[in-house]
Amino acid sequence: MADMKRLKHLMFSPFIDNNPIALQVLGICSALAVTTKLQTAIVMGISVALVTGFSSFFISLVRNYIPNSIRIIVQMAIIASLVTLVDQLLQAFAYELSKQLSVFVGLIITNCIVMGRAEAFAMKEPPLESLIDGIGNGAGYGIMLLVVATVRELIGSGKLLGYTVFQTVQDGGWYQTNGLFLLAPSAFFIIGFLIWGLRTWKPEQAEE
């Protein structure tokens, strides 16, 4: 039976202590693309968490039967199958969101977080631990997306999840929107400030 303390560590350490974006600087490309709106960031975060968790689980199940020479191909086949399933489900039940996310759901297969957990963890550890580790890392990625998307949508349009938070000047209110935050470069700066803030709060995360 898996140790509960270890499972909790695997699940929650990627949230702050070992965040895949803030500490490992992985998955940056999609973080720039899907964080203009909080809704797309939520869906992308959930998608990555599920794909990372279940791909790690299935890879761990068959890890002892995969020849070393083709392990990357097998990992990518499993990940691609799950990504295709997620993409089809989004198209079936959330078509508008699927169109907004465009190719970025399909590109989860190339996300370094998914491949990294499969290669570094799932190939060495039991299925349950691999599942928890994958979901934890996907959730850590999703948390960063949520923070970035909240800042970008709120400052860029005065809205969150499509609901008005700050009444804009155009609608007779006081808030002047800042279109810069709806452009990709703003995500770089926000992520940079988040990394700086985390490493100031936790100096042990700073690189030597």
Swiss-Prot record:
TM region positions: 42-62, 72-92, 103-123, 131-151, 178-198
InterPro entries (UniProt xref): NqrD, NqrDE/RnfAE
UniProt key word tRNA-binding: no
A cellular-component GO term for this protein: plasma membrane
EC number: 7.2.1.1
Catalytic activity: a ubiquinone + n Na(+)(in) + NADH + H(+) = a ubiquinol + n Na(+)(out) + NAD(+)
Molecular function (Gene Ontology), one example: oxidoreductase activity, acting on NAD(P)H, quinone or similar compound as acceptor
Membrane topology qualifier: Multi-pass membrane protein
GO biological process, any: sodium ion transport
Pfam families, A to Z: Rnf-Nqr
Keyword set, alphabetical order: Cell inner membrane, Cell membrane, Ion transport, Membrane, NAD, Sodium, Sodium transport, Translocase, Transmembrane, Transmembrane helix, Transport, Ubiquinone
Subcellular location: Cell inner membrane
Purpose of the protein: NQR complex catalyzes the reduction of ubiquinone-1 to ubiquinol by two successive reactions, coupled with the transport of Na(+) ions from the cytoplasm to the periplasm. NqrA to NqrE are probably involved in the second step, the conversion of ubisemiquinone to ubiquinol.
Subunit structure, as described in the record: Composed of six subunits; NqrA, NqrB, NqrC, NqrD, NqrE and NqrF.
NCBIfam families linked to this entry: nqrD, PRK09292.1, PRK12405.1
Cited PANTHER family: ELECTRON TRANSPORT COMPLEX PROTEIN RNFE (PTHR30586), NA(+)-TRANSLOCATING NADH-QUINONE REDUCTASE SUBUNIT D (PTHR30586:SF1)
Family: Belongs to the NqrDE/RnfAE family.
Protein name in UniProt: Na(+)-translocating NADH-quinone reductase subunit D
Organism listed in the record: Neisseria meningitidis serogroup B (strain ATCC BAA-335 / MC58)
Highest classification ranks of the organism: Bacteria, Pseudomonadati, Pseudomonadota, Betaproteobacteria, Neisseriales
